[in-house]
Every structure is written in C-alpha cells, then in structure tokens.
C-alpha cells in the first residue's frame, strides 16, 4: 500500500525535478526502515545519462523542497538515484531510449498462457512490440503484452 503522503510529496518532487532539468521517474517512501527512507528516481529531460554528481547536486534542492513543505514529521533519509537495469519499460520514451537493448517480454499467447520472449528491442508501435530473436523478428501483439523489462546481455 502506498504511503499516505505520496500524493502530497509527488508534486513537490516533480516540480523540483523539473526546475533542475530532470523528470521525476518514481518516488517511494519506505517506512519499514529506521529512519524511514524517501527514494526519488530522476532522469534528465534531454535524455542524457544522470551522473552521480547530478544525484548529489539534486539532493540539496530536493531536501530543501521537502523541508519547506513540512510534510514529513519524522526523521528520514533522502536517496536520489536514476533508473537502472531491470526496470520495466512503460512510456514511449522508454521504448525509444532502449531500442536495441536486451529485453524480456512477458505476454499471453493465443491460449491465454503466460510466455516469455527474450531478444533485442526493435520497437513498440500501436499494434505490436517487435523483438529481434537471433536475427528473426518476433512481433507480439501489444494487447497481449503484460510487461517489457530490460535484462542484462547474458539474460
């Protein structure tokens, strides 16, 4: 269950990220850790890589924004990162950015059984996700796709 403050904190994080040339990818509040942890994932709006210096530089403004809103009343750790390998591709931008990267597509076949297909991502259009599997193009109906996830080159 998402933390009840997430709807209040998300717009603060999104606007702070935008003001510094980033896009908010995800925010999580982990209350099972002591102190609780606020994890903020960002990516650059221009599509270039987020560096460690970017994360460190964004930590200050993000922390100040959270403090100014006084939404968190207990001690917390703020973690800034960028999405890494293993993430699920969701937006059109994700599919463009990771074209030719190794992916695993989870989908339902014609009988409704879950299937997995690994290969290099070619594209996602309105109708299909296309993956290169050892030189052959596999087209999977977009309506059948459950998820597309980046994988390491060795699988």
From Swiss-Prot:
It is found in: Cytoplasm. InterPro entries: Ribosome_maturation_RimP, RimP_N, RimP_N_sf. Keywords: Cytoplasm, Ribosome biogenesis. It holds the Pfam family RimP_N. One of its GO terms (biological process) is ribosomal small subunit assembly. One of its GO terms (cellular component) is cytosol. SUPFAM superfamilies: YhbC-like, N-terminal domain. Required for maturation of 30S ribosomal subunits. Belongs to the RimP family. This is Ribosome maturation factor RimP. The lineage of its organism: Bacteria, Bacillati, Cyanobacteriota, Cyanophyceae, Synechococcales.
């Amino acid at each position: 269950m998402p933390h009840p403050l997430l709807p209040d904190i998300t717009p603060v994080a999104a606007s702070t990220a935008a003001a510094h040339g980033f896009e908010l990818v995800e925010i999580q509040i982990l209350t099972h850790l002591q102190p609780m942890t606020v994890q903020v994932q960002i990516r650059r709006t221009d599509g270039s890589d987020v560096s460690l210096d970017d994360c460190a530089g964004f930590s200050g403004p993000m922390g100040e924004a959270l403090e100014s809103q006084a939404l968190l009343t207990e001690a917390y750790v703020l973690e800034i990162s960028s999405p890494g390998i293993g993430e699920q591709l969701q937006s059109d931008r994700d599919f463009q950015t990771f074209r030719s990267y190794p992916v695993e597509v989870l989908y339902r076949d014609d009988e409704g059984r879950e299937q997995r297909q690994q290969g290099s991502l070619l594209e996602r259009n309105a109708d299909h996700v296309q993956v290169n599997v050892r030189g052959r193009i596999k087209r999977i109906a977009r309506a059948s796709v459950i998820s597309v996830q980046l994988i390491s080159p060795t699988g």
